[in-house]
Amino acid sequence: MAKEQIKVSEVKRTRQKGGAVVTVDEFLSLKRPKGDLILKVGREQVSVTSLDRIYWPEEKLTKFDLLSFYLHVADYIMPFLQDRPAILQRYPRGIKAPMFFQQDLDSAPEFIKTARLTNQEGRQLDYGVYSTTASLLHFVTLGTIEQHPWH
């Protein structure tokens, strides 16, 4: 299946939300942070929000814990995700709350690459593409717990 880059104007580009800018090492050294931060990953800055949101109630694991996990495994999983469009299975309120699938991106930061593809129903959709660790973390901060790349 051929993919083509879509025009920037097709996907609304968003600005980073407020918060202190921290490096990956500073982020990983935090103990139970609350609120929002901007995480500097390579050349990109990823807005990470609601870090204290509980994703797994029984274990009391938060969005911060999930982002930390993905930072630790990014070097191992990015080769398998690299340059593939993302089908986002989002749990924005944690695993006990309703989830939904998102394929068609309506907005994204400038550093998120996009691809316009035709889905199984014949509709053209604008997918976010896993291109860097920053893109992976952006999808995670949207509530994407599992990663589902388009094959």
Model-predicted regions and their roles:
Residues 1-36, 40:
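Intrinsically disordered, low-complexity regulatory tails
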Residues 29-31, 35-39, 44-151:
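Active-site loop/lid in soluble adenylation, ligation, and acyl-transfer enzymes
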